Amino acid sequence: MDNKGWSLKGSLLPLLLLVSDLLLCQGVTSLPICPTGAVNCQVSLRDLFDRAVILSHYIHNLSSEMFNEFDKRYAQGRGFITKAINSCHTSSLSTPEDKEQAQQIHHEDLLNLILRVLRSWNDPLYHLVSEVRGMQEAPDSILSRAIEIEEQNRRLLEGMEKIVGQVHPGVRENEVYSVWSGLPSLQMADEDSRLFAFYNLLHCLRRDSHKIDNYLKLLKCRIVYDSNC
């Protein structure tokens, strides 16, 4: 890894500090939300949504920065964007494309959809971190963002499971998710093919994190504030 591009001492640090302050104010510096051994610990649904919205927005910001940096460093003049359209592994999940479509979906279905998308990213994010470590001349800022996103995605998933548990207590949702099979593409010998695989994965991550961020804001308004927001 070289030190070119942004680093944690650069543009990412203010964002990390801001989110850290927000999470401290909300009491969510770590998950599980309840301390180990706590009995009958209960966090309000409003607080759970507040934390989830903060995390989802943070993840989307990180994924956007990571994609933009990768695009600027590796993808210029390669025509990747035209090939990346509609080629995400989560395309098998029927997700609303805009706010108007999302508003037509029952909140229970939208909550379960968020869970499925988050679970669909567990495996690719794990391998993204591993493969970025092995990239020649990859800036530390891309790796640091990949590591942070993987961790925060797990935290957001756990928080969403708690939200679903409060909205629909006693109902267990099947752990349905979209399987990712892109690891061989990240390891291809052909440079163009390998770089496109990374580009496409980061493009999809930015897309899905934006959708989740919007869905959560909509659900918070609908469930917590009875759509009066």
UniProtKB/Swiss-Prot annotation:
An annotated Gene Ontology molecular function: prolactin receptor binding
GO terms under cellular component: extracellular space
Disulfide bridge map: 34-41, 88-204, 221-229
This protein's UniProt keywords: Disulfide bond, Hormone, Lactation, Phosphoprotein, Secreted, Signal
Secretion signal, residue range per the UniProt entry: 1-30
Modification Phosphoserine, positions: 56, 64, 120
GO BP terms in the entry: female pregnancy; lactation; positive regulation of cell population proliferation; positive regulation of lactation; positive regulation of receptor signaling pathway via JAK-STAT; response to nutrient levels
InterPro entries on file: 4_helix_cytokine-like_core (IPR009079), Somatotropin/Prolactin (IPR001400), Somatotropin_CS (IPR018116)
Pfam families: Hormone_1
Compartment(s) where it occurs, according to its Swiss-Prot or TrEMBL record: Secreted
Domain of life of the organism encoding this protein: Eukaryota
Annotated CDD domains: prolactin_like (cd10288)
Predominant place of localization: secreted
Subunit-level organization: Interacts with PRLR.
Function: Prolactin acts primarily on the mammary gland by promoting lactation.
Recorded family membership: Belongs to the somatotropin/prolactin family.
Name of the protein: Prolactin
Organism the protein comes from: Neovison vison (American mink)
